[in-house]
């Protein structure tokens, strides 16, 4: 059991110097204003502004700036700097928090009607701990990763305690009859623009210090048990947010706890069980609501919340194929397009010089099947002075070029990634080599000289990849794609030796198409672009491929699985399912396991089958448009009966994928499986009382 009150507000020796509310407010505003400059690509301005102050808010701001750079680029040196700054911020905030609690009765200190004295500094500690935890988990050291989880736990407890203060405030306001002060106001496009708040009636300050001293959080407590009615959802112009310290605490607690709940809800099944054992419980819906609430505020935290929402929606949601059906009027788990577009437009207006928000605009276009526009946005002359943002821009450009089969640009861009970022150089070389392999195959029969040059480059980049694999680690483990790349190239080298052919002729199914599949590029493609992928896949069985007759069931299964994925994206579900049944499920799974084998085929096929079943549902078709053809054309009366069967079968395949023994890329595929199972459970809950 954790005594939150004694930890958060325990009595410690404190300085006799009190914290003046005016100087505290000035420090907060100065620090947040300076730190926000990094989101407009003004790194020097942010660093210079923050160097002028020594307050806990300035220390936190310096930590935030380093943290943003660290998480955008994963560079070890920047992560070390971030860790040092965040440790300093945590220590400073702890001292100020104890001082604020000790001097809480001084006449010149700020007294909030919502939060106990010193809560703003408790939040600073939690933010520093949360960011330190992320840096620790990203670190290559297992020891640092474990320390990161310890910090995460401390931040989790603090944030939960702060949010319980808000719940207590809401309850007291209701009990005293002042319902207007906690009335939920109409939500705008994620930023509260244009809405007017009901003036808050005076509410007596709540003595939460005593309440918190008796509050315990056990390791198995579910902090996410409260619903939307227990959350403050007021807009920034509400009377309860007259003081910027309260704005900072409210927006900060919502952002930090929201991102925690969201991230924990996304982790793969095996890992989520471990997190549950040590007291972490995710809640995607509540987490997203909290992020949207934080994004309303015109400060650094509001912008970070907006970046998180856009990143989740244009990245994770579009990466996953099975997501909850949108809820009319207040959808947060799906893809609320108008709301997201309004949020992005506001951020672009606030930060016109930033390449970061341009990157998000590109991602949004890609997520909405406008890959040409997405690529064009990233091919401009402007460069970010922030190396980490520039690396992200080039990486995103590389992926878009890959989806569009722009092989020359794809290869050039991934080679540029090698220079800009050291995170996964083996993968960058592998995809660059794969792009040149595609160029080689395209012209081998018409221009032997040019084809030979592309073959030479393909071999050069393929052989550069394995020595770089394993250089970077996540929680002391090799990155999933590093393992994949090393095995693939070893497999091709072994085949080249066995078949006595050049390396480029020992490669099987188009590795670019395989990569498009793993990055879920098909969901971003138009019908015409999907047809191009089908054409590229057809090369394997063409006369141009002299080694196809030597291929075994493994490579042929990969070809059919990739074809099935393209067919699903085309909404040709019957064909996709039949292809999976006859080409993969009819095979003994032992044929796909063993040395140098692609052991991911079977579990991924189960996920693909589940995705087809989910997308065939009458509800899905009503929202997204019907499939190109279907052998099952139900009447309205049988829609629900059919949908129940489809969801049941979908869940069966997902559970098989979730329980599959360890395989290559299981962590990556596991993210999709976790999201899918959650979507299915939400559907089951919504339809539990509906007769079928």
Swiss-Prot record:
Biased composition (Polar residues): 175-184
Gene Ontology cellular-component terms listed: cytosol; mitochondrial outer membrane; nucleus
Domain of life: Eukaryota
UniProt entry keywords in alphabetical sequence: Cytoplasm, Nucleus, Phosphoprotein
Protein name stated in the entry: Inclusion body clearance protein iml2
Reported function: Inclusion body (IB) resident protein that interacts strongly with lipid droplet (LD) proteins. Involved in LD-mediated IB clearing after protein folding stress, probably by enabling access to the IBs of an LD-stored soluble sterol derivative that acts as a chaperone in inclusion clearing.
Pfam families, sorted: Iml2-TPR_39
Organism (species): Aspergillus niger (strain ATCC MYA-4892 / CBS 513.88 / FGSC A1513)
């Amino acid at each position: 059991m954790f005594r939150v009150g004694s930890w958060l507000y325990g009595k410690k020796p404190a300085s006799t110097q009190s914290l003046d509310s005016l100087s505290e407010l000035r420090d907060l505003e100065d620090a947040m204003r300076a730190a926000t400059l990094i989101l407009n690509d003004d790194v020097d301005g942010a660093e210079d502004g923050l160097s002028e102050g020594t307050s806990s808010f300035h220390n936190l701001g310096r930590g935030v700036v380093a943290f943003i750079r660290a998480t955008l680029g994963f560079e070890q040196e920047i992560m070390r700097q971030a860790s040092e700054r965040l440790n300093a911020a945590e220590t400073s905030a702890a001292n100020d928090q104890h001082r604020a609690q000790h001097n809480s009765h001084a006449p010149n200190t700020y007294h909030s009607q919502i939060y106990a004295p010193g809560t703003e500094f408790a939040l600073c500690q939690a933010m520093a701990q949360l960011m330190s935890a992320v840096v620790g988990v990203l670190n290559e050291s297992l020891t640092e990763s474990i320390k990161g989880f310890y910090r995460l736990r401390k931040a989790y407890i603090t944030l939960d305690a702060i949010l319980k203060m808000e719940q207590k405030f809401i309850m007291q306001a209701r009990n005293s009859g002042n319902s207007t002060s906690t009335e939920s106001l109409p939500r705008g496009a994620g930023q509260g623009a244009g809405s007017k708040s009901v003036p808050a009636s005076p509410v007596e300050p709540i003595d939460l210090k005593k309440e918190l001293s008796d509050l315990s959080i056990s390791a198995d407590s579910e902090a996410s048990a409260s619903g939307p009615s227990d959350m403050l959802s007021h807009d920034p112009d509400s009377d309860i947010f007259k003081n910027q310290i309260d704005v900072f605490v409210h927006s900060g607690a919502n952002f930090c706890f929201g991102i925690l709940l969201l991230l924990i809800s996304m982790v793969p099944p095996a890992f989520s069980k471990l997190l549950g054992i040590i007291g972490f419980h995710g809640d995607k819906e509540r987490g997203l609501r909290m992020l949207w609430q934080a994004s309303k505020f015109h400060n650094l935290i509001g912008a970070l919340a907006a970046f998180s929402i856009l990143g989740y929606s244009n990245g994770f949601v579009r990466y996953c194929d099975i997501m909850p059906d949108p809820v009319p009027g207040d959808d947060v788990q799906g893809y609320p397009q108008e709301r997201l577009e309004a949020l992005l437009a506001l951020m672009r207006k606030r930060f016109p010089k930033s390449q970061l928000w341009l990157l998000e605009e590109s991602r949004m276009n890609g997520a909405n099947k406008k890959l040409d526009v997405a690529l064009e946005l990233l091919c401009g002359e402007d460069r970010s002075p922030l190396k980490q943002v520039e690396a992200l821009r080039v990486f995103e450009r590389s992926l878009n070029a890959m989806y569009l089969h722009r092989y020359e640009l794809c290869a050039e861009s991934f080679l540029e990634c090698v220079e800009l970022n050291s995170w996964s150089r083996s993968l960058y070389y592998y995809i660059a080599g794969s792009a040149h392999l595609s160029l080689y195959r395209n012209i081998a029969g018409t221009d032997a000289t040019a084809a030979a040059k592309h073959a030479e480059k393909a071999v050069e980049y393929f052989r550069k990849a394995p020595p770089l694999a394993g250089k970077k680690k996540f929680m002391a483990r090799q990155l999933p794609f590093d393992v994949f790349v090393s095995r693939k190239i070893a497999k091709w080298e072994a085949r080249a030796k066995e078949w006595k052919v050049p390396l480029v002729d020992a490669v099987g199914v188009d590795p670019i198409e395989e990569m498009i599949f793993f990055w879920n590029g098909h969901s971003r493609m138009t019908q015409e672009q999907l047809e191009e992928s089908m054409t590229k896949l057809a090369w394997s069985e063409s006369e141009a491929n002299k080694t196809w007759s030597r291929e075994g069931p493994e490579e042929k299964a990969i070809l059919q699985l990739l074809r099935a994925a393209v067919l699903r994206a085309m909404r040709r579900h019957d064909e996709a399912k039949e292809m999976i049944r006859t080409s993969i499920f009819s095979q003994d799974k032992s044929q796909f396991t063993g040395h140098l084998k692609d052991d991911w085929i079977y579990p991924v096929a189960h996920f693909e089958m589940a995705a087809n079943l989910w997308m065939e549902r009458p509800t899905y078709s009503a929202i997204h448009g019907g499939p190109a053809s279907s052998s099952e054309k139900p009447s309205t009366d049988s829609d629900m009966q059919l949908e129940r069967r489809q969801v049941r079968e979908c869940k069966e395949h997902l559970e098989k994928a979730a329980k599959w023994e360890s395989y290559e890329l299981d962590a990556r595929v596991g993210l999709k499986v976790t999201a899918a199972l959650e979507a299915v459970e939400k559907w089951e809950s919504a339809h539990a009382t509906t007769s079928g």
